[in-house]
Amino acid sequence: MNKNELVSAVAEKAGLTKADAASAVDAVFETVQSELKNGGDIRLAGFGSFSVSRREASKGRNPSTGAEVDIPARNVPKFSAGKGLKDAVNS
């Protein structure tokens, strides 16, 4: 499912126009990004948690030349599925 399909599904299930559903979906995505960028996390009971994890600097190799390269430290987003989502997927 891509973003347009998600917007259509939200519009249908919530009885919204596609424009209103698109605004709602965009608002959710922007809020998640903003909260994670500011170092926060988002916990949705029964669905899962979004958080940021720090990945330390490391050494890697260029696959075509074999030369060693430095990979800088960075923040990476993480999602951990909640019990409700896991149960729904496995039922």
Swiss-Prot record:
Source organism, top-level taxon: Bacteria
CDD domains per UniProt: HU
PROSITE patterns reported in the protein's UniProt record: HISTONE_LIKE
GO cellular component entries: cytosol
Alphabetized GO MF terms: DNA binding; structural constituent of chromatin
Gene Ontology biological-process annotations: chromosome condensation
Keywords: DNA condensation, DNA-binding
SUPFAM superfamilies, sorted: IHF-like DNA-binding proteins (SSF47729)
Family note: Belongs to the bacterial histone-like protein family.
PANTHER family with a match to the protein in the record: DNA-BINDING PROTEIN HU, DNA-BINDING PROTEIN HU-BETA
Function, as annotated: Histone-like DNA-binding protein which is capable of wrapping DNA to stabilize it, and thus to prevent its denaturation under extreme environmental conditions.
Full protein name: DNA-binding protein HRL18
Organism from which the protein derives: Rhizobium leguminosarum
